[in-house]
């Protein structure tokens, strides 16, 4: 049997859980069973890995590489916390979703704090779309992010939905679309998200590029120029080399996210330490941090400090779009993200 590396070189794809999750309903039953099995295998592998990494103090001490990815994002090892799936919400409609519904929530609950302590989970709210607004220098996009409301359909995902120009597209479909689009998804993938044929998917992308202020110029002019030059300059002034045009926009968004989050962590930690708060930073994953504290009072004060600190980061880095955070307090990771 070929390993994944050989298989990718030969066929251009691998038989992975991620790829099999894109199977259409019309795929053979055997393919769906294989997808279910791979999902179960992945959950079992994670549990075995976690048990093996648990130390005498009952904790897992993972490793962080602060610029482990080419974009400047952190990478993680032993275990890779970035690959731990979020809990599945809603009614499972496939065998794979049933596996996720059964296991992913309980697996998140395993990541908890000491008895009596609280976990504060805070993330940089909508950070990649805010970085996109910064790159486009679009006041209209900023307004939708900052002042738009889901209730009256003026929020950013409803704005994106209307920009696609397809009547049956829902807000949730538009939300899935925008992140796939920004990561460089091809027309077949976008067609599957929007539940249209490829011609309609291409038309939707064209509509989107024309409708969103500043996006066409970013995608058609700025990104190709950056790719030809071979690098972009991040929010903190560092030059970041880009491997190719296809990965450039996603790289710029991830780099912006990474720079903002790292500056923010330094800012709120300094402020919390100055106040003498008792806290323990226990995890950073992309746009979120998890912090252990001994009381609800400290948890609430820490959240206020984190919000205030993000405002200073926006000013320090001169980000075009206002930045924001959202927080939850709980006893485990399931409750805080």
Where are these regions (language model features)?
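Short, hydrophobic/amphipathic alpha-helical patches that form generic packing surfaces
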Residues: 32-49, 129-134, 176-184, 251, ...
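Short acidic (Asp/Glu) and glycine-rich catalytic loops that position anionic groups and cofactors
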Residues: 3-17, 107-115, 130-140, 155-160, ...
């Amino acid at each position: 049997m070929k390993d994944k590396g050989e298989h990718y070189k030969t066929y251009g794809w691998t038989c992975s859980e991620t790829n099999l999750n894109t199977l259409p309903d019309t795929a053979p039953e055997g393919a769906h069973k294989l997808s279910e099995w791979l999902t179960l295998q992945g959950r079992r592998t994670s549990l075995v890995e976690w048990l093996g990494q648990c130390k005498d103090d009952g904790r897992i001490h993972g490793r962080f590489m602060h610029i482990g990815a080419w974009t400047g994002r952190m990478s993680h090892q032993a275990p890779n916390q970035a690959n731990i799936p979020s809990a599945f919400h809603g009614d499972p409609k496939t065998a794979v979703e049933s596996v996720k519904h059964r296991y992913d929530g309980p697996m998140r609950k395993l990541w908890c704090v000491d008895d009596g302590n609280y976990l504060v989970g805070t993330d940089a709210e909508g950070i990649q779309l805010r970085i996109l607004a910064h790159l486009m220098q679009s006041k209209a996009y900023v307004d939708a992010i900052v002042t738009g409301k889901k209730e009256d359909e003026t929020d950013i995902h409803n704005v994106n939905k209307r920009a696609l120009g397809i009547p049956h597209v829902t807000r949730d479909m538009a939300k899935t679309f925008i992140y796939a689009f920004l990561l460089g998804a091809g027309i077949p993938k976008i067609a599957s998200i929007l539940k249209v044929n490829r011609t309609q998917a291409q038309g939707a992308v064209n509509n989107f590029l024309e409708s969103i202020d500043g996006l066409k110029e970013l995608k058609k002019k700025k990104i190709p120029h950056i790719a030809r030059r071979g690098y972009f300059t991040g929010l903190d002034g560092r030059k970041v080399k880009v491997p190719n045009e296809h990965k450039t926009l996603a790289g710029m968004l991830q780099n912006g996210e990474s720079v903002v989050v790292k500056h923010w962590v330094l800012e709120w930690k300094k402020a919390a330490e100055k106040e003498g708060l008792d806290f323990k930073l226990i995890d950073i994953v992309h746009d979120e941090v998890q912090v252990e504290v001994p009381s609800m009072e400290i948890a609430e004060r820490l959240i206020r400090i984190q919000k205030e600190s993000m405002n200073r980061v926006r000013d320090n880095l001169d980000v075009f779009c206002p930045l924001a955070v959202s927080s939850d307090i709980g006893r485990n990771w399931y409750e805080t993200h």
